[in-house]
Amino acid sequence: MVLIEFLTGFFYLYGKRLFSISKVMDMICLDYYTIIPAPLAMMLAARIKNYDLMKRLHEWEISVDYALLVVDDVPSIDFCLSLGAKSPTRAQKRQLLRDNTFNPVYKYLMNCSGFPTRREKNIPCDVQCERLQKNIIKELVFNCSVLLEMVLHTEREYAYALHCAAKHNQLPILMYCWQQSTDAESILLKTCCSDKNINCFNYCILYGGAQNLNAAMVEAAKHDARMLINYCVMLGGRSLNEAKETAAMFGHIECAQHCFELQSYVMDALNADDAD
């Protein structure tokens, strides 16, 4: 099943149809590695430290040299060397980078150690890396969730994937990233408030335990998301003083006035209930 999942992740990659569904069983039984971009298959296996799969790919005559492009820990390097890997030359790296079949993913897997274009030469490497990571994650959120799970490693990467999934209502990926992120609730609140996204806000409440509606209203006030503030009041939010102060602090004067008026309505309603 793992192998099948590995293969099916490549049906559509960056909008390109790499092979037809009818060929899946043929590939499992025959030389399927000639259809999948061989370097990418080896690099993905190396990236997730699946030594068994690396060995099988090596037996199918896929060069283990590609694995050395993406591993940096001693056990993985030793394993590659034990299979006869030779470190790829600079020229080989350049040649691989020109293969547009898997160019973006390849650059990402190399931890952004690819060669910058002329336009990028004056851009710091860490900035190039961050831009590339974000572009890759954004593409994979829509096109290849199996591959996305393979390339996400750091908290920052999970956070951005969670942000993209929430922004575009990709619920399965949102739930996966939520489980992996230690700051999921905060990220979702910022995303849904900045985009004024009710669906995202609902995910945050339903799945993340974000029952602190007052805190949610404060976050919404930062982005002048009055619709979400109204929503919080409808769900039971009662204290708008901090949200009002936050809106004023961020220069959202109309939002601050809105919070003040809402607080008055809430207090009148509470007093009426007490009188009854």
Curated annotation (Swiss-Prot):
Induction cue: Expressed in the early phase of the viral replicative cycle.
Protein keywords: Early protein
Task performed by this protein: Plays a role in virus cell tropism, and may be required for efficient virus replication in macrophages.
Entry similarity comment: Belongs to the asfivirus MGF 360 family.
Protein name: Protein MGF 360-15R
Species name: African swine fever virus (strain Badajoz 1971 Vero-adapted)
